[in-house]
Structure formats: structure tokens, C-alpha cells
Amino acid sequence: MQCCRMEGEIMNQRVGRSSIRLAQPVCVIAGASIVGKKEGEGPLGALFDMVGEDDLFGCKTWEEAESNLQKDAVYMVMEKAGWKAEDVSYLFAGDLLGQCIATSFGISAYNIPLFGVYGACSTCGEALTLGAVMAAGGYAEHVVCVTSSHFASAEKEFRFPLDYGNQRPLSASWTVTGSGAFALGLNQKCRAHITGMTPGRIVDYGLKDSMNMGACMAPAAADTIERHLEDFHVQPQEYDRIITGDLGSVGQTVLIDLLREKGIDIAGRHMDCGIEIFDADAQDTHAGGSGCGCSAVTLAAYILPKLESGKWKKVLFLPTGALLSKTSFNEGKSVPGIAHAVVLESPVVK
């Protein structure tokens, strides 16, 4: 199916059942990453724009600290893009807390029209998808996308108070303290191009273990990857990397096995942001990192530079989310997953 507008206007193209190919790529003009001390001590520590000395970031509460992460990340990415707040048409932002309070308190001072989005740890992919479509459609000149998470605020929201000192199983992940922000627009200097996307569907295999979110999210990632390859008529080898957000070591194994059952082999090209951001053994993070800050800061600090330099030509970036809450968990509900895929390509032509 092809959707056209009048001559002279931008044409976008829908491909397959549920994917979009942008007729005019959207530029990722800049990315910014701010993380906590633990993330700064990990393998990617030297790549982040800013590393906090402690996880309160000079604030009185964990939630206020996360709000400051978003505020500072948005300021930093606008500064990199050469924009002021009044130059930004729309802001797409989200976090893990109830009613997205980290977002609403964090970016309120900018006075930018806000689309608050929530897809759990897939929120970065959702924000980039919606922001890119808005820019590609000619509805916005400048767009900022930002997501955040915080280990302590997430533990308080979804699990146990830190003072409780509960033991975590090896399948558990460690919520990343960090915020990643991105400036999007058309016909501008690019660090990478957004050329297409495959929005995720809710996939529920009936798993109820909130301490094994990688396994809960892996079926959704497999579903999105399979649909993406079918819609775009491409093979995994056409991507330098297929990058999930925070499946961790357990979820990675499940994802690879699920796709192999469908005749799709991504083992040699799969990368997971949650595995990359921590040294699981040295930092005792078990299955790896998680949170909607995990994929965002890894994209800004690690993935974009590889695309900008031309070392990677094309990647499929799909943050993964576990759609649970305290209420759903306590009522015995399962943990559905979702994964939004975004195609990122290098601006370097060789």
C-alpha cells in the first residue's frame, strides 16, 4: 500500500502489513547521554556525555533525580543541535514511573508541546518512531525525543524498597540510571538517518516472572523482527547489527532460539544494549541492564558514532518493553512484551 499526497509534498510509504518506509529519511542531528556512576564504570563509560558522581544528582529524591536527568539531557541535545527551546516543534518523552512523572516534572520548564509516551523499556523506540513520522510528514521542523530510567526509582516503583535488601535471581536485570535524548529534523547535518520502522505488537506468552523480564520480552522482539524482515523483504545479513534494548543474556538466548524455529538466524548479528552497558560479572548486574534509559544512552553514546563514521552502514534498533505494573503483578497477571523497531542508516556514502 502506498500513501501519496499532492505533487510537491512529501510522500511516505507503508510497506507490508505494518511497517513504514520513509520516502525522505529523517536526520538524527544529535544525541546526548547522561548516566549514573555505575553506568560510568561500565564498558561504555568513557563514551557518555556526562557521568554523575552519585545517583541523586544533587537532588533530595530518586524521582527528582530522574527528572533532572531528562531536563539536562534535553538541554544538552538542543545545545548540540544549535537549538533553543522555542525552536523545537514537539517533544516526545517518557519514563517508567507512574503517570510518567519523571518526564512531566523534568521538561515542564522548557514550555515545548509534549507527547508523553509509554512503552516501558521500549519507549525510546516508540518516541523515535513517532517523532520521525511527525518530521517526515512535514508536521514538525525540529523534534526532540528523550527517555529516562533510574535504578532506585524503578526498584521503588516495581519491586522492593532498597533498604529491604532482597536477593535477586541471576535472570534479573539492573535498571540503568540514565537519560538519552535525540534531535530530529529534515535536510540537516546527520549523524544517522531514520529510514523506516516496524511498530511493535503486544505479545504475551503467559510468563509471570517479573525477575526474568528478558524472557518475557523476547517473544515480542522475535515477532517484530520477523514482521520487519517480511515487510521489507530483507535478510538479517543486510544489517550490520540487529540491536535489542534490554533482553539481557537470558532474553538473548530465548530470542535467538525463537527466531531459529522460524528459520531466521540472527546469532552472528545480534547485539543487546543491556549486555553492552555493564560488565555483568565485575559489576554484579546478573542478566544485564534494563530500563528505557538503557537503549537510549547506548544509542546516543555507542551506536550513533559507529553510524556517523560509516563503520556500520545499517542497523535495526528495537528497544524492548515489559508491560507490567505493581497492580498487574500483584493480581497475578502475566508480563506481556512489546518491541518497536527503527531502521538507522549511516549518512556516509562509500
Feature-to-residue mapping (PLM):
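Short glycine/threonine-rich loop-to-helix capping motif typified by GTGT followed
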Residues: S104-I107, L247-K262, T327-V335
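Condensing-enzyme catalytic core mediating Claisen C-C bond formation in acyl metabolism
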Residues: G8-E63, P161-E226, D231-V234, D265-D284, ...
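Conserved beta-ketoacyl condensing-enzyme motif
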Residues: V28, W62-C121, E238-T253
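Active-site-proximal alpha-helical scaffold in enzymes
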Residues: Y118-C145, F182-L184, S290-K311
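Short, well-ordered amphipathic alpha-helical segments that serve as non-catalytic structural scaffolds
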Residues: E66-G82, L130, C216-D231, T298-I303
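Acidic, glycine-rich active-site loops and adjacent beta-strand->loop/helix elements
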Residues: G94-Q99, C121-S122, T147-S153, G200-R201, ...
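Cysteine-centered motifs
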Residues: C3-C4
